[in-house]
Amino acid sequence: MPPARAQTLPTPITVPPPPVPVAPYLPFPQFGLLPLDETNNGFGFAQATARAKKLQARMQWIDATANLDRINTAEKVKVVVAAIKGAGFTSICFEAKPISGEVLYDSKIAPKIKSFAKAGQPVKTLPADFDPLAAMATECRAQGINLVVNFNAFAEGHQLFGTGPGYANPQWQSVLYEEKPVLQIPFAAGGLPLAMRPNELPLAENEIAVYTDPARVSADIPKRNPQTAFVIVVDKAGTVVAQTLGTAWQSLSVAIPDGGAALVSQSTGSSDILRRFAAVGVRLSVQSSPIFVPIGQRPRRQVPLMTNPFRQDVRDRTLAIIAEVVRGYDIGGVIFDDRLRYAGLDGDFSPEAKSAFEAYVGKPVRWPDDILRFGYRFPTMERTMTPGPLYDAWLVFRALTLRNFLADTVRTVKAIKPQVTVATYVGSWYPDYPDVGANWAADDFAAGFRFLNPSYQQTGWAGLTDFVVTGCYYTTATIADAVARGENIGETVEAAGQFSNRAVNDASWTYAGIQLADFKNKTPDDLKRALQAAGATTQGIMVFDFSHDWEQWRPVFVDAFKTPAVIPHLAPDSLADVRRQHAAKKAAGVVDPPAILYRGKSGTGF
């Protein structure tokens, strides 16, 4: 045996206490002291520059359809602009192309919106001979407001109403990949189509509905053929534990087991098969196969009718609409809303996407297996996803496609009017965005996310823009507030704004978005605290939306914005200075401290 090595035993060490936290920066000192994390909030050259030069964006968003009755005459537009300016805002974001693909200006390319109505609300109309964008541009120029025009890039229809040019042009629509499930019953020939979405009445009558919520069974059976409905109850292994007529469901003594489900047929043929072959004790299973469907055939999937970014005609159309506006109207900037993305991880799986991806990786691919395969946990029908060998390459490829489209947009805009700014709006919870292909961070942002490999990192688009707005849509203002209430600290304006600023990483200006609808049952002080946190963590504030009881909150804005500030994206050379300082720090080998990865709420700002 070799001689034992001498063992080094641990010894006590001494560690000095951390420095006392520095006093927080308060963009609105009149609102009073707020417990803010200045060490992390003040990070970066963009923050330092904005504070030193007294730069702060103050942007009011005007949603097209929600405000249609407020901007459908020249006089109304004048009143709206005056109200916003009088409250201290210095920029207006006006939506010219909403998700429907119908525009709010006189276009030679896109149809003009005529009216809009939600259930239970009066119809809002737009006179055919009135151009709201022209009136908005005129008033913003006259009243000294920076006008930024909003476009929903890859949306050409409203699925709640079936309106928009994407319906007349189905070839534009995003193609979704789905796994079509089939219920397998021993000794029954073939199988029965199974609904993909649990606890919903399927659109197709021949599909077997799946419920984990017994109340939904009771609610849905009367809606369609209750006399022919048949119900079987299965446990978590898929074994039938009960069966009954739909009309007798309410009196069934067997409850849905934990992890189990009720399967409901409402067509005569399917009900007969279940009755004959799915007896108590029989174990059922599910098989699935991939199908590819245009999003217009899935109206429950999401409200916007998303289009296919891999199609040249779709990209060209969007660029042509933007060029038409930049060329024809006196505007200060353009911004893409949150539809500069794909429909989800399930889209786009069109032939164009397959061809472009094969060119990207340089070989044929098994479609969709090399990328991913969806599946289901039977009987609850929870969707599963298994990555394929090219999954990481697929995420990079999708993000690269959108990044390059944004670069095309910047070139298009600047070639017409170099002074017009280009920006993007996104939700603040960055880990949502690989699924939809939008890498809104800087191309040198590093953080501990599985998807953020060196290739994906390079697809970051922040540096292409003049500013990035992130939806920090929370009502809890500060991290300290969340700690005191026992809440998740990531679901705060401060954490969202702080992370957004770190992700953009001096590549552009960062503005924090606040959603007024979230404050419906809150107090003016709650909104003041949110504005304070937004202004302390980023270089500006965007307020969404003018339709959200705006007049109720106007006194808060008047108080907040009474001290003038310069708009960062209009400050000569300031962003260039920020970028130069950042580049010099990198060249000197200075390594930034790790970004704090707060757990935000999925879907925030979408």
Predicted features and spans:
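Hydrophobic faces of well-ordered beta-strands that scaffold small-molecule active sites
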Residues: 58-62, 92-94, 147-149, 334-336, ...
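Aromatic-lined carbohydrate-binding/catalytic grooves of carbohydrate-active enzymes
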Residues: 89-128
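Substrate-binding cleft of secreted/luminal carbohydrate-active enzymes
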Residues: 455-605
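Mature N-terminal, pre-catalytic/accessory segment of carbohydrate-active enzymes
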Residues: 2-94, 138, 183-260, 267-270, ...
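Glycine-rich, aromatic-flanked loop segments that form ligand/cofactor-binding clefts
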Residues: 35-48, 89-100, 132-197, 226-229, ...
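Polysaccharide-binding and catalytic clefts of secreted carbohydrate-active enzymes
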Residues: 83, 169, 174-193, 246, ...
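Catalytic domains of carbohydrate-active enzymes, especially glycoside hydrolases
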Residues: 75-102, 328-332, 458-470, 537-541
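Active-site mouth loops of central-metabolism enzymes
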Residues: 62-76, 303-317, 446-448, 517-525
